[in-house]
Amino acid sequence: SGCESFLNPRDLTEDGLCPDHLKKPEEVKEENYFFKLSKYKDRIIEHIKKNPDFIQPEFRANEVLNQLEHIEDISVSRSKESVSWGIPVPGDDSQIIYVWIDALSNYITALGYDPETPSDMFKTYWPADVQVIGKDILKFHAIYWPAFLMALDIPLPKTILAHGWITIDQTKMSKSIGNVIAPKDVMETFELSHPDAFRYFMMVTAPTGRDGNYSDLDFKERVNADLANNIGNLLNRTLNMQVKYFDGEIKQEFITDSDNEIAKEALKTVQLVKNRFDKYEVAEAAQEIVNFSNTVNKYVNDTAPWSLAKEGKLEECAKVLYNVLESMRFIAALLAPYTPNISQDVYEQLNRSEKAVEVKLDELKWGEIPVGKITEKEKIKPVFLRLDSEIAGAAKKG
């Protein structure tokens, strides 16, 4: 298999191989139709420079600009003899349309594009806000695709987001090597009842646009640290203290306002996460959430609510616990795109009726855990058990 693209000698490795697939290209000589890509070179360069969000992450834009310096007109058909199947060129059955022409056009034809009578779907959803593609096919989406759209006088997508690859133990996945891992294999190996842990890891393992790596050890260490030790343990011990000292009940005098430092940190974290999401920085957004949970854990250790209760400072203890429970509500809402099942478990243990995944970040306000009994001893359970623990294996909880 290959990339089905034309390569100049300067595009090859020192050994004369395709840089993406490390295979020797096939030399073909035939008569084809061409698209005058060079005609749109300056327009594409201008568009990239005037619209810094067009190619994300930004360092990929520089790669595309360098490629544009040497851009040439491209063959957009193949002879029927060399390609046995495909869409015939209109008016010339001896030629088949080049795969990247019909593949790219699917983005708009699937929406019902028609130059004379475009569908309502096309008018509603095009131009796309963002097109997410792999870094190895960036040239086709950031050079060829804009040129085709310009030729048709169709608006360009607002952003092309190029993601990196996921390697396995620092090696590129390959069927020939036999190191391809399917998500269901991970779930079966670790006896996960839902995919949240794997989903979380895959979303946080690679900074925006960079490669990420999967290994069993990295997976276990990351999800145990973030989901079990940090977030899960924080909720569990706080709810247990709420039951132990206050019978699981929150009274009006326990509720804190948004002027306290933890509340300020919670609201600040919401804004940081939103800003990260706006820039498609998914892994970085998760780190903001983990940073906040670290802050809350430190707050618990510093204030020592168990000591406050022992000293008879019950109202002070209650306010500390309320701050932590409210923080957990914020953390669950922020984590919902990563761990929808775990976030919902947190919401249910906080006696919340709404769906965690439906919470709008703009509407997150401090002080919304209401007065009344929110839990009891029998209802408290770990939302995420450490992987490889005997309990995790037996309970098949993930």
Give the role of each language-model region.
Residues 94, 98, 195, 221-232, ...:
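Amphipathic, non-membrane alpha-helical segments in soluble helical-bundle scaffolds
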